[in-house]
UniProtKB/Swiss-Prot annotation:
Chain's gene name: crb2
Record-given protein name: DNA repair protein crb2
Organism: Schizosaccharomyces pombe (strain 972 / ATCC 24843)
UniProt keywords, alphabetically: Cell cycle, DNA damage, DNA replication inhibitor, Nucleus, Phosphoprotein
Signal peptide: none
Subunit structure, as described in the record: Homodimer. Dimerization is mediated via the BRCT domain. Interacts (via BRCT domain) with rad3. Interacts with rad4 (via BRCT1,2 domains); a single rad4 molecule interacts simultaneously with both Thr-187 phosphorylation sites in a crb2 dimer. Interacts (via Tudor domain) with histone H4K20me2. Interacts (via BRCT dmain) with histone H2AS128ph (gamma-H2A). Interacts with chk1. Interacts with sad1.
Lineage: Eukaryota, Fungi, Dikarya, Ascomycota, Taphrinomycotina
Length: 778
């Protein structure tokens, strides 16, 4: 074999002058080093003349002490199984190493500590080579095409299938499923320069420039020092490698941590950060945070915005916007504003002059009657006087301090200023009644509108007996019985002239942000369109509404309709129709009487339950029990269109489906006079079960308040009890069948043995009575 370029000697790691071959040092086993020199034919020594084109042979010493020559092909010869068997037969411990030298062979045992030192130096090369992969493949040199792609006839049989055959794995490695560690001669690690004719830096430069490459016949991995090529599997070292600072700077990522599966491509920003790291941070690892490269967070945002949009996300946008708001001039912060990619649209914070309260004066402060529960007179702000289309009288739209909007009559509102001797209550003092001593202003600073009264006072001194206490005037509320003594504080035309009112059309305060269907969007647009013309007409000022459902998800926009009803004077009951009646379970008695309406229901004339279709939901069944109309949402739209409360009969829904009759029944509403109050009509009504005595058997009735109310089954039982009371029956709750006079016995499962021969029914019987609106037992 002839080679025309002497650079091949350098590529193979051959020192021609010293006649040494460092590749011969690669004959390594797991336990020891054994020289495999069987069947090696000696060849004449190589001449020192560099003009000779034939490779020489390096000298070595055999077991008999004779000098032997190694041919070039022996460098690539894989040890046979016989050689491994010969090695394993030798009685040598695992801690013994055989040190190879080109002139002699010396066997010396090494301690585990020294073995660790050898391994440490091996990890300095950043790789571990298994014992069956100890051969070194030739480098890719331009003038060595025959070596890179050897013919079978030119190479030994062990290399004839090297390109297409995977490397063999010993049986021990298959069992252990790991790659064995390699123990290298200490002389290689200590005297590295003796085996190379150029320094490590030169080798790195050639590798980086592409002059030294791996052979395409093997899966090669480039190593640091020395540069070895072969099929290598490595594990992370348990100690810190002794590597130069330059190598760490070259191998660490400076922008973001990434896994091995992600392509860590450097951008302009990362290269810029890398240069900054090299100059200002000479630590061994040179890993810094991006926040240390700039003086302020705004600089970091500006730099990242110039690189790529991948750094932009919703959370970052939101944080930047919040920073811009906090740095606005209105908050008097010295921090400079952020002027970056994310703040192109100027953010205009709400100024004090633009707040809704600024359009009103403290003279607008009133005490208004709250139609919900509990019903007292609370501090509120008068929004505007409105005209009622039903009563043709002036009403007042007010906003309570908790932002609740309501509409009250002229006899349900008073100017909010207190006089000495007024009997009031405070939310900070419980239900105890106190007498007003005096009111005063505690500070000269500008206070919120909800913190003062109509005289711009913010504190009040109250007395209870001989004890006086000072509380904020915004915590005051007055019972309807005591409001009659508030003489001289009615609203008049002269007092209204001094007040400031908003020029508003009372549109819905907000649009629904939930995803609506096209049907819901048409509902909202229709409602808003019909509000623009005569929006000040409170057509629902004497109406109460309860919304059930929708049963179908996209049936109607419930939120928009609730807002429209409230803005037109109506009251929306979120919990159903129960607030209109007394609480039957408040008495804590087992014998319950039929329901009676509360007197506050005198404020309304009509009540409606709105749903898209009939159902067996609680609010819907309550409406059937109280004989209150259940209407379609189209009823509200028609009222807005006609600007008055229209006849509800065309919009009535069915009562429900009767399993007993196997059909759907219509809702039958008794005719009534709309001028009568809701209280009078409910009080005069008698349900279909009026006069009936029902015994409700509940096993936990002995402690029904603790057990029944706190369980799902118990709440269902109480709902059926409430429906029976709404139908006019008297109900008694017992844990078992007692010898009591009753018309029928109601149980949750309907299975009970009764000796009194009373009919036993289940809750479905109550539901059938509600749907049919009659007593089905007769």
């Amino acid at each position: 074999m002839e080679v025309n370029d002497t650079s091949l000697h350098k590529g193979f790691g051959l020192d021609i002058n010293s006649q040494r071959v460092f590749g011969a040092q690669a004959a390594i086993s797991r336990n020891n080093y054994s020289k495999v020199n069987a069947s090696i034919n000696p060849s004449p020594p190589r001449s020192n003349d560099n003009s000779n084109k034939e490779f020489s042979y390096s000298k070595d010493v055999n077991n008999n002490g004779a000098v032997e020559e190694l041919s070039l092909t022996q460098l690539f010869e894989v040890p046979s199984q016989a050689a491994f068997a010969k090695q394993s037969s030798q009685d040598i411990s695992d801690d013994e190493l055989i040190q190879h030298d080109s002139r002699k062979v010396i066997s010396s045992p090494y301690s585990p500590k020294q073995t660790h030192t050898v391994l440490k130096r091996l990890y300095d090369r950043q790789s571990v080579i298994s014992d069956h992969e100890k051969l070194l493949t030739p480098q890719n040199v331009s003038n060595s095409s025959q070596i890179l792609s050897p013919f079978t006839s030119l190479l030994p049989s062990t290399l004839s299938t090297l390109k297409d055959t995977p490397l063999s794995v010993s049986q021990n490695e298959k069992n252990l499923e790991t790659v064995g560690e390699v123990l290298v001669p200490e002389t290689v690690a200590q005297h590295r320069t003796k085996f190379y004719d150029y320094t490590l830096d030169e080798m790195e430069n050639e590798t980086e420039s592409g002059q030294v490459e791996t052979t395409p016949t093997r899966l090669a991995t480039s190593l640091g020092s020395p540069v070895l090529y072969g099929r290598v599997e490595s594990t992370p070292p348990a100690f810190l490698p002794e590597t130069s600072e330059k190598q760490y700077k070259r191998k660490f990522s400076f922008t973001e941590p990434s896994s091995e599966k992600v392509d860590n491509t450097e951008t302009k920003f990362s290269k810029k950060t890398k240069n900054i790291n090299d100059e200002n941070f000479p630590n061994p690892f040179n890993v810094i945070s991006s926040y240390e490269t700039s003086a302020s967070p705004s600089t970091v945002i500006d730099q990242s915005s110039q690189v790529s949009s991948i750094f932009v996300n919703k959370r970052l946008r939101k944080s930047v916007n919040n920073q811009a708001i906090s740095r606005s001039d209105s908050l008097s912060l010295d921090t400079p504003k952020i002027d970056s990619l994310f703040t192109r649209a100027s953010i205009k914070p709400l100024k004090p002059s633009q707040s809704p309260n600024s359009r009103r004066s403290f003279k607008n402060r009133v005490l208004a009657f709250f139609k919900g529960y509990p019903s007292f007179y609370y501090p509120a702000t008068l929004v505007a006087p409105v005209h009622s289309a039903v009563t043709s009288s002036i009403m007042y739209k007010v906003q309570f301090d908790d932002a609740t909007m309501s509409t009250v009559n002229s006899n349900q509102i008073k100017r909010f200023f207190l006089k000495k001797g007024d009997v009031v209550q405070s939310t900070r003092l419980g239900k105890i009644k106190h007498t007003v001593v005096k009111t005063f202003r505690s500070t000269n600073e500008q206070l919120s509108l909800i913190a003062v009264d109509a005289l711009n006072n913010d504190m009040v001194i109250l007395a209870h007996g001989e004890i006086e206490v000072t509380v904020p005037i915004s915590t005051i509320y007055v019972a309807p019985v005591n409001i009659r003594r508030f003489q001289g504080r009615d609203l008049s035309f002269s007092t209204l002239k001094d007040m400031k009112f908003e020029e508003t059309s009372f549109l819905p305060s907000h649009d629904s942000q939930r995803n609506r269907s096209s049907l819901k969007e048409r509902d909202s647009s229709f409602v808003k369109k019909n509000l623009d013309s005569e929006s000040n007409q409170l057509i629902f000022d004497d109406c109460v509404f309860a919304f059930s459902g929708p049963v179908h998800e996209d049936a109607y926009d419930r939120s928009a309709l609730e807002t429209v009803v409230q803005d037109h004077g109506g009251l929306v009951l979120d919990t159903g129709l129960r607030p209109l009646f007394n609480d039957p379970f408040k008495s804590k008695q087992k014998k319950l009487r039929h329901l009676k309406p509360q007197k506050r229901s005198k404020s309304w004339n009509q009540a409606f339950v709105v749903s898209d279709t009939f159902s067996r939901k609680v609010k819907y069944l309550e409406a059937l029990a109280f004989n209150i109309p259940c209407v379609h949402p189209q009823f509200i739209k028609q009222c807005l269109k006609m600007n008055r409360v229209v006849d509800f009969s065309p919009y009535l829904l069915a009562s429900g489906y009767s399993h007993r009759l196997d059909c759907t029944l219509s809702q039958r509403i008794e005719p009534f006079d709309t001028t009568d109050s809701l209280y009078d009509r409910l009080l005069a009504r008698k349900g279909p079960l009026f006069g009936k005595k029902i015994l409700f058997i509940i096993p936990e009735a002995k402690s029904w308040q603790k057990k029944i109310e706190n369980t799902e089954q118990g709440q269902k039982a109480l709902a059926h009890v409430y429906h029976a009371l709404a139908l006019g029956a008297d109900v008694e709750i017992r844990p078992n069948v007692a010898h009591l006079e009753c018309d029928l016995i109601l149980t949750m499962d309907g299975n009970i043995v009764d000796e009194t021969n009373c009919p036993v029914v289940d809750p479905e019987w109550i539901v059938e009575c509600l749907i049919s609106q009659s007593d089905i037992s007769t």
